[in-house]
């Protein structure tokens, strides 16, 4: 039988962890001094007047490199618990993890051939 009272601690932590950041933003918005002017609208470059436009457009290669990094980072997050409980789970879960890794290898080969891993 599914009992909700077993999750009281979870709900308490969820509520507390949601309320604290909201309160921090509200309190800082109320207590912070409001100072608007031309200095606030200019960008800060090491204490000197800005030279040129402050808005830069990054090349798409940086985003592709970051996206590939996130994919392999998520792979590590999924494979670590599997590796810690490998002896308990058995062969069927090993085959599933092997399929998961093979799909990621195919994806990395695809990204490599498309040039997403080249920095220059």
From Swiss-Prot:
Where in the cell? Plastid, Chloroplast thylakoid membrane
Q: From which residue to which does any coiled coil extend?
A: none
- What is this enzyme's class at the first EC digit? translocase
Gene Ontology biological-process annotations: photosynthesis, light reaction
**Keyword Translocase found:** yes
Give the keywords, sorted: Chloroplast, Membrane, NAD, NADP, Plastid, Plastoquinone, Quinone, Thylakoid, Translocase, Transmembrane, Transmembrane helix, Transport
Enzymatic reactions: a plastoquinone + NADH + (n+1) H(+)(in) = a plastoquinol + NAD(+) + n H(+)(out); a plastoquinone + NADPH + (n+1) H(+)(in) = a plastoquinol + NADP(+) + n H(+)(out)
Concerning InterPro entries, the annotation shows: NAD(P)H_OxRDtase_bac/plastid, NADH_UbQ/plastoQ_OxRdtase_su3, NDAH_ubi_oxred_su3_sf
Documented EC number(s): 7.1.1.-
Which ranges does the record mark as transmembrane? Answer: 9-29, 64-84, 88-108
Which cysteines are disulphide-bonded? Answer: none
Instruction: Return one GO MF term.
Output: NADH dehydrogenase (ubiquinone) activity
Cellular component, GO annotation: chloroplast thylakoid membrane; NADH dehydrogenase complex
> Mainly resides where?
plastid
Membrane-protein topology: Multi-pass membrane protein
UniProt KW Kinase keyword = no
Summarize the subunit comment. Answer: NDH is composed of at least 16 different subunits, 5 of which are encoded in the nucleus.
HAMAP family assigned: NDH1_NuoA (MF_01394)
Family named by the database record:
Belongs to the complex I subunit 3 family.
- Described purpose of this protein according to its UniProt entry: NDH shuttles electrons from NAD(P)H:plastoquinone, via FMN and iron-sulfur (Fe-S) centers, to quinones in the photosynthetic chain and possibly in a chloroplast respiratory chain. The immediate electron acceptor for the enzyme in this species is believed to be plastoquinone. Couples the redox reaction to proton translocation, and thus conserves the redox energy in a proton gradient.
Name under which the protein is recorded? NAD(P)H-quinone oxidoreductase subunit 3, chloroplastic
Q: Which organism is it from?
A: Platanus occidentalis
| Gene from which the chain derives | ndhC
């Amino acid at each position: 039988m599914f009992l909700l009272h077993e999750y009281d601690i979870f709900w308490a932590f969820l509520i507390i962890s949601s309320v604290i950041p909201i309160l921090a933003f509200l309190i800082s918005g109320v207590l912070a001094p409001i100072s608007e002017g031309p200095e606030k609208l200019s960008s800060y470059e090491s204490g000197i007047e800005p030279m040129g436009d402050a808005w830069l457009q990054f090349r798409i290669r940086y985003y592709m490199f970051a996206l590939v990094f996130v994919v392999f980072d998520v792979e590590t997050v999924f494979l670590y618990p599997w590796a810690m409980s490998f002896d308990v789970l058995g062969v069927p879960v090993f085959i599933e993890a092997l399929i998961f890794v093979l799909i990621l290898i195919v994806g990395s080969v695809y990204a490599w051939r498309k040039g997403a891993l080249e920095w220059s």
